[in-house]
A protein has these predicted regions:
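N-terminal Rossmann-like NAD(P)+-binding domain of SDR-like oxidoreductases, especially those catalyzing
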Residues: 1-180, 223, 233, 296, ...
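C-terminal substrate-binding subdomain of Rossmann-fold SDR/epimerase-dehydratase oxidoreductases
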Residues: 24, 31-32, 58, 187, ...
């Protein structure tokens, strides 16, 4: 009999890659989604797997809907990849971040404990937990210093997952995920702003407007990270693992690499990037796009995951950029 997995956040970047990977491994995959939220299946549609997902109503604010979803699907594994807000956006509705990203995980764990404590549970934690980290790179033992309501809520979720594991002997674990991108990344993230923006710029559209070009990120590929999630949940013992590349590049360097891939000769004049052939503006900046509270340098040490789980990455930064650029060129070739 096939294993069953409930993926909460199945319509997101990580959820679609995880669902695809699980389906390829023979799993029966259930996708948890809020009933009154407009369905956003574009990622699953683009991957061609929408019809293979069995959708169930699940709202992390509603304990009863969580219980109903778990009772209906009877999963062997539950992956919580849902998040209401990211980073500084959580300042707009801090209470909702708390109720969804923090207390929502408590509701999940309590439902699993009551219905079937043998269900394995994976919680997607975030490198934002480290905030202004006091050591670089960060390991599983680096102290946390969250810098936003989102990060505070995720820290509660991280700790309550460990608490339930220790108190009730549940197989519950967290993956501390550093930045990971893909063609399925949302358009408000800087990497997609760049790859989509350049695809449109090639079609005669406006220059790309960015924030701080010197911000450094540890960027990996979501496809690699969802494999790490599955390895974490299938380890001999439940533990926390960092998933990261261990390397950072700046936003400016990401732009440069993308331009190089597209064979666009360019030069920088301060924070403006122009086409060498005709001096046409490609990229500019606006202070309005700068984050009000920048975290410290976040770069993860995934030695533990590599050593204990055998986790390895298929994509380097150039492979990630190539994958994202080709996808956006296909999408916007007729724009």
């Amino acid at each position: 009999m096939s294993k069953k997995a409930l993926v909460i956040g199945v319509n997101g970047q990580d959820g679609c890659y995880l669902a695809k990977s699980l389906l390829e491994k023979g799993y029966r995959v259930f996708g948890g989604q809020r009933r009154n939220t407009p369905l956003k299946h574009w990622r699953l549609n683009e991957m061609g797997i929408t019809d293979n997902i069995e959708f169930v109503d699940l709202d992390l604010i509603d304990q009863k809907s969580i219980q109903n979803a778990i009772e209906k699907t009877e999963p062997d594994e539950v992956y919580n990849l849902a998040a209401q807000f990211i980073g500084t956006l959580s300042y707009e509705k801090p209470k909702l971040a708390k109720f969804v990203d923090g207390l929502g995980v408590l509701r999940l764990l309590e439902s699993i404990r009551q219905i079937n404590p043998k269900i394995k549970f994976f919680q997607a934690s975030t490198s934002d937990l480290f905030g202004r980290a006091k050591e670089v790179p960060q390991t599983e033992s680096t102290p946390f210093h969250p810098r936003s309501p989102y990060a505070e809520a995720k820290l509660y979720a991280h700790h309550i997952t460990i608490n339930y594991r220790e108190k009730y002997n549940m197989f519950a674990c967290c993956g501390i995920l550093f930045n990971h991108e893909s063609p399925m990344r949302g358009e408000r993230y800087v990497t997609r702003k760049i790859t989509k923006g350049l695809a449109l710029w090639l079609r005669g559209r406006k220059p790309i407007v960015l924030g701080n070009l010197e911000t450094q990120k540890d960027w990996g590929h979501a496809e690699d990270f969802v494999e790490g999630m599955q390895l974490t949940l299938n380890a001999d013992q439940p533990q926390e693992y960092i998933l990261a590349t261990g390397k950072t590049i700046t936003v400016r360097q990401f732009v440069d690499k993308t331009l190089t891939y597209l064979s666009i000769p360019a030069y920088w004049k301060n924070d403006d990037c122009c086409d060498k052939r005709n001096n046409k503006l490609i990229v500019t900046t606006d202070k309005a796009y700068r984050r009000p509270v920048e975290a410290g340098q976040l770069v993860g040490d995934s030695t533990k995951a590599k050593t204990e789980l055998g986790w390895d990455r298929k994509y380097d930064i150039d492979g990630l950029i190539a994958d994202m650029v080709e996808a956006d060129l296909r999408r916007y070739s007729k724009s």
